From Swiss-Prot:
One Pfam match: YgbB
Gene name per UniProt: ispDF
Top-level taxon: Bacteria
Annotated site (Positions MEP for the nucleophilic attack): 169, 222
Region named 2-C-methyl-D-erythritol 2,4-cyclodiphosphate synthase: 245-400
Protein name as catalogued: Bifunctional enzyme IspD/IspF
Annotated positions binding 4-CDP-2-C-methyl-D-erythritol 2-phosphate: 251-253, 277-278, 299-301, 375-378, 382, 385
Taxonomic classification: Bacteria, Pseudomonadati, Pseudomonadota, Alphaproteobacteria, Rhodobacterales
Molecular functions per Gene Ontology: 2-C-methyl-D-erythritol 2,4-cyclodiphosphate synthase activity; 2-C-methyl-D-erythritol 4-phosphate cytidylyltransferase activity; metal ion binding
Entry-linked PANTHER family: 2-C-METHYL-D-ERYTHRITOL 2,4-CYCLODIPHOSPHATE SYNTHASE, CHLOROPLASTIC (PTHR43181:SF1)
Function: Bifunctional enzyme that catalyzes the formation of 4-diphosphocytidyl-2-C-methyl-D-erythritol from CTP and 2-C-methyl-D-erythritol 4-phosphate (MEP) (IspD), and catalyzes the conversion of 4-diphosphocytidyl-2-C-methyl-D-erythritol 2-phosphate (CDP-ME2P) to 2-C-methyl-D-erythritol 2,4-cyclodiphosphate (ME-CPP) with a corresponding release of cytidine 5-monophosphate (CMP) (IspF).
EC number: 2.7.7.60, 4.6.1.12
Metabolic or biological pathway, per its Swiss-Prot or TrEMBL entry: Isoprenoid biosynthesis; isopentenyl diphosphate biosynthesis via DXP pathway; isopentenyl diphosphate from 1-deoxy-D-xylulose 5-phosphate: step 2/6; Isoprenoid biosynthesis; isopentenyl diphosphate biosynthesis via DXP pathway; isopentenyl diphosphate from 1-deoxy-D-xylulose 5-phosphate: step 4/6
């Protein structure tokens, strides 16, 4: 691996909005490891309410960056393919005699050479949404990326039961998966590989590909020994606890010269326009802030500073899409949104249905999960004096 570490930083929200690569998650589940004990291969063994492979599959199924799922099975396990389920497109292929051969079988099934592939051990069921997002961002930025943790313990060499020396730990990392590449590049690297390889990073580097390190996760360990099942089950039970969050958002914009206002993504004719650094969509801003609030992650001003000229006149749906994607990356599903617009004029009623449809589309929600309504302030305050429009929003998030 190269020694550049791409910690937890993200690509910019504008880049995130524009870049929507096709991402295939390849889950390697063709092994026959015996160290974990039991009669079944470890990926098929129960882990709480699900099997190991089901937990792993669900993690990538929830990841917003992932487009499809490709599972590599042992030839004798192909009859179990029908027991695997996912919301996203799911395919299963038969693996080979070694891990590398199994990965090569999966890569042969990915048609787009520019697609990003995330190659992951099915026996790492506690992989997080944040880690998946970091690897995808690393591939977008550098072409290849993999998670790892720096070695922090002292390292010895030994013979039998005696210490024979010390090993410097500077520059040493514990490798994890998913390891991300462009499909065509890593497929060519596998085709050129000779001999055994510890993982796909070794194969990539042998082909001359630089690989960036992204920050790994201590919980993303590989089930290897019998005691690992209890540890993984405890972590997944804790993660699976019901976590419901509510966020509130409030925004206001004053009137200025113009002939229309934009509210909840819909242009409404009016004798004035709302003033703001972006398109001044007060409704969408309130909803976006409500999502950030539920995540405990600041507000629009922190993610899209008004001092940054790139957001001058920007469409507010960029901000909302960013907040929705951020919630999904952190493992949350938005289950409901309620937005109230406060103004004397323009009248919102004729545009209510199209506003609701627009917000449903942008947030990936059903119509009955979205409410957009309007009220007046009975001629009181700045909205009553028709100096501007205010909006309040409440959003509910559930960890999935």
């Amino acid at each position: 691996m190269s020694h550049r570490v791409l910690g937890t930083e993200r690509i910019s929200p504008r880049e995130e909005h524009v870049l929507t690569p096709n991402v295939t998650a390849i889950l390697v589940a063709a092994g026959r490891g015996t160290r974990a004990g039991g009669g079944l291969a470890k990926q098929w063994r129960p882990l709480g309410a699900r099997r190991v492979i089901d937990w792993t599959l669900a993690a990538f199924d929830r990841a917003t960056q992932v487009s499809e799922l490709l599972v590599v099975l042992h030839p004798e396990d192909m009859d179990l393919a029908a027991t695997l389920t996912a919301a996203k497109p799911l395919r299963c292929v038969s693996g080979g005699a070694t891990r590398s051969a199994s990965v090569a079988c999966a890569l042969a099934a990915v048609a787009d050479p520019e697609a990003i592939v995330l190659i992951h051990d099915a026996a790492r069921p506690v992989v997080s949404a944040d880690l998946i997002a970091r690897v995808v961002a690393g591939v977008i930025e550098t072409g290849a990326a993999a998670p790892a943790l720096p070695v922090v313990d002292a390292l010895w060499t030994g013979a039998g039961d005696r210490v024979t020396g010390m090993q410097p730990r500077d520059g040493l990392y514990r490798a994890q998966t998913p390891q991300g590449f462009h499909a065509g590049a890593i497929r060519d690297a596998h085709a050129a590989a000779t001999g055994a390889a510890a993982d796909d990073v070794e194969i990539a580097r042998a082909a001359g590909m630089p690989v960036a390190i992204v920050a790994g996760d201590e919980q993303n360990f590989k089930i290897t020994y019998p005691q690992d099942f209890a540890r993984a089950a405890a972590l997944l039970k804790e993660r699976d606890k019901m976590d419901i969050r509510t966020g509130n958002g409030y925004d206001v914009h004053r009137f200025g010269t113009g002939d229309a206002v934009i509210l909840c993504g819909v242009e409404v004719p009016h004798d004035r326009a709302l003033m703001g650094h972006s398109d001044a969509d007060v409704g969408m801003h309130a909803v976006t802030d409500a999502i950030y609030g539920a995540l405990g992650d600041g507000d629009i001003g922190q993610h899209f500073p008004p001092s940054d000229p790139q957001w001058k006149g920007a469409a507010s749906e960029i901000f909302l899409r960013h907040a929705v994607a951020l919630a999904a990356e952190r493992g949350y599903t938005i289950t409901h949104m309620d937005c109230t617009l406060v103004c004397e004029r323009p009248k919102i009623g004729p545009y209510h249905a199209v506003m609701k449809a627009k917000m449903s589309e942008l947030m990936g929600l059903q119509p009955d999960q979205v409410s957009v309504k309007a009220t007046t302030s009975e001629r009181l305050g700045f909205t009553g004096r028709e100096e501007g429009i205010a909006a309040l929003a409440t959003v509910t998030l559930v960890r999935t």
